[in-house]
Amino acid sequence: MTSKSTFVLGHRHLLGIEGLSAADITGLLDLSEEYVELNRQVDKKRTVLRGRTQVNLFFEASTRTQSSFELAGKRLGADVMNMSVSSSSIKKGETLVDTAMTLNAMHPDILVVRHHASGAVELLARKVDGSVINAGDGAHEHPTQALLDALTIRRNKGRIEGLVVAICGDVLHSRVARSNIILLNTMGARVRVVGPSTLLPPGIERMGVEVARDMREGLNGADIVMMLRLQRERMNGSFVPSTSEYFNYFGLDQKKLGYAKPDALVMHPGPMNRGVEIDTAVADGAQSLIREQVEMGVAVRMAVLEALARNLPNA
């Protein structure tokens, strides 16, 4: 299979959704559509990255994102290396900059990086010659998650512009929320964040979103309900009285889903905490797109890898 799309991303790295134009996003989504179809065929291989080296460098635990990037790279023909941080020099006191310079000396073409500190991926990108993809940095951004969410929405609703998207839960600690807000605003959606005051960033309205502090108001008229998990690993205090009380007020069950439009669809970036932010009946119900999001993730990451590879020397 040869891509029909001639889209070239005018960036060396993908560090965030911020800085991407609507045309950039549309180009990546259109290219992703080709990979959705390819991934449903028996032969899923392409040779776009043949001879290229992709290093996955994850400083935080990941199941979906890391395995998705690994599969994407291999299906495109790359030599993929997963670097284990638990056994790396980082654990022995090496700085991130030294790690970047060491890796750069091995001439990787693409680095896929997840790090617990906001801005760490951008710092690393300044020190390497290849392309860098942000697979999530602290509470800052997670660009490929926002892209796969956008692809999922577009395939099911036919558009993004004009839709009402309610992002519910722990917005304060969520890089997924930030990237989605930027992308959805860029593409003309109407974005609403929903959650208790303790889990909403101060001044979030400045990002161009509506704010609701209860689910009835927040889900009213929503086309898409995007749930977020409580990110306890980023919390250094008590943000909710208890998980059971949180579920009573902000967990998505069938009753609360009824506040949204009758044809509203449910999304979640995973991993889910069933019975905390989402009820099993909703997560596995007919309005759920959660499994489809995982499928779209591989296609989007293949598209991002190809788009960046087109900018590499001798591409």
UniProtKB/Swiss-Prot annotation:
GO molecular function terms listed in the Swiss-Prot or TrEMBL record: amino acid binding; aspartate carbamoyltransferase activity
Residues that, per the record, bind L-aspartate: K92, R175, R229
Superkingdom to which the source organism belongs: Bacteria
Pfam families to which the protein is assigned, alphabetical: OTCace, OTCace_N
Catalytic activity: carbamoyl phosphate + L-aspartate = N-carbamoyl-L-aspartate + phosphate + H(+)
Disulfide linkage: none
Sorted UniProt keywords: Pyrimidine biosynthesis, Transferase
Function: Catalyzes the condensation of carbamoyl phosphate and aspartate to form carbamoyl aspartate and inorganic phosphate, the committed step in the de novo pyrimidine nucleotide biosynthesis pathway.
NCBIfam families: asp_carb_tr, PRK00856.1
Entry protein name: Aspartate carbamoyltransferase catalytic subunit
Organism of provenance: Bradyrhizobium diazoefficiens (strain JCM 10833 / BCRC 13528 / IAM 13628 / NBRC 14792 / USDA 110)
Gene name as annotated: pyrB
